[in-house]
Amino acid sequence: WLMGHMVNAVKQIPTFLNDGANAIEADITFKGAVPTYSYHGTPCDFGRDCIRWEYFDVFLQTLRDYTTPGNSKYYEKFILFVLDLKTGSLNNNEVRKAGENVAKGLLKNYWNDGNSGGRAYVVLSLPDIAHYEFIRTFKEVLKAEGHEDLLDKVGYDLSGPYLPSLPSLDSVHEAFKKAGVDGHVWLSDGLTNWAPLGDMARLKEIVKRRDSENGFISKVYYWSVDRYSTTRTALDVGVDGIMTNFPYVIIDVLNENGYKDKYRLATYDDNPWETFKK
C-alpha cells in the first residue's frame, strides 16, 4: 500500500495518484467534536505546503468520486485512504461525539448512505490510545443506522501519544480490546522527513508482533519515507505500506532488482485486514 502523505486539498488527489500512489492520507481537524477541515498546518514535512485544505464534507464527496466505478473521475487503482484524525485536544465526551460525527459524515458523504458510494477501504488513525471510545462510538453509529456491513471496509490505527514516550504494544493491544476491535488493525511508526533516521527499533518490534502467533496487527506501515535508501530499509524490515511525499521514489525502488520479485503494489482484490504470510 503506497500512501500519498498529507493530501488535504482535492486538487492534490490526482497528482499523487498519477505519481504512483494507490492510497492517500489526509489530516482531519476538528472544531470541538465536529470534523471540519482536511488540514495539517505548520510545521509539516520539509518541502511541503502545510496549509492546503478543504472542507471535510467536500473532501469526502471528492474521494467518493475518485473511488466510484462509472464516475468520470474514477481511478481503479485508488483503493484505500487513511484519515489522520486530529483528536489530540478533545476531552472524552468530545472524543465520543467526534466518533459519531465522523461516522455520520462518512456514511452521508462517502458511502452515499449505503447506495453505491465509494468502494475504497478506510483506515481511521487516532493519535492517542486513550481515544478508543471514538472507535466504539463510530461502530455503534453505523450499526444503529443499519449499515454494519460497511464496517467490513474500515480499519483502525491507534499510534500514540508520542510524549513523553510511545505506549507499549501491549498497551496498544489493550486499547484495541477496549474499542471492541479484533482484526482490521493497522499500526504505524515513523518520523517527519526532516528528522534523522533512527534504527527503526519500534518498527521492527511492530513487524515482529504482526508475525507472531498471537499477533493482533494486520498491517504495518512507515512514514514519511522520501529517500530511496529509507524505502529499501523499510521494505527490508517487512512493512506492508509506506507513506510518502514522493510516490515515484517508492515506485522506482519497487522496480529494482531485489525488490520487484518480492513486492508489488496492492490492488482492490488484496485484503488490507489480512496478514500476509510468507
From Swiss-Prot:
It comes from the Eukaryota. One of its GO terms (biological process) is lipid catabolic process. The keyword Hydrolase does not apply. Belongs to the arthropod phospholipase D family. Class I subfamily. It is an enzyme of class 4 (lyase). Disulfide bonds join 44-50. Dermonecrotic toxins cleave the phosphodiester linkage between the phosphate and headgroup of certain phospholipids (sphingolipid and lysolipid substrates), forming an alcohol (often choline) and a cyclic phosphate. This toxin acts on sphingomyelin (SM). It may also act on ceramide phosphoethanolamine (CPE), lysophosphatidylcholine (LPC) and lysophosphatidylethanolamine (LPE), but not on lysophosphatidylserine (LPS), and lysophosphatidylglycerol (LPG). It acts by transphosphatidylation, releasing exclusively cyclic phosphate products as second products. Binds 1 Mg(2+) ion per subunit. Gene3D superfamilies: Phosphatidylinositol (PI) phosphodiesterase (3.20.20.190). GO terms for cellular component: extracellular region. The active site is at 5, 40 (nucleophile). It is found in: Secreted. Expressed by the venom gland. This is Dermonecrotic toxin LlSicTox-alphaIII3ii. Its EC number is 4.6.1.-. Its cofactor is Mg(2+). Keywords: Cytolysis, Dermonecrotic toxin, Disulfide bond, Hemolysis, Lipid degradation, Lipid metabolism, Lyase, Magnesium, Metal-binding, Secreted, Toxin. InterPro entries: PLC-like_Pdiesterase_TIM-brl. Mg(2+) binds at residues 25, 27, 84. The keyword Hydrolase does not apply.
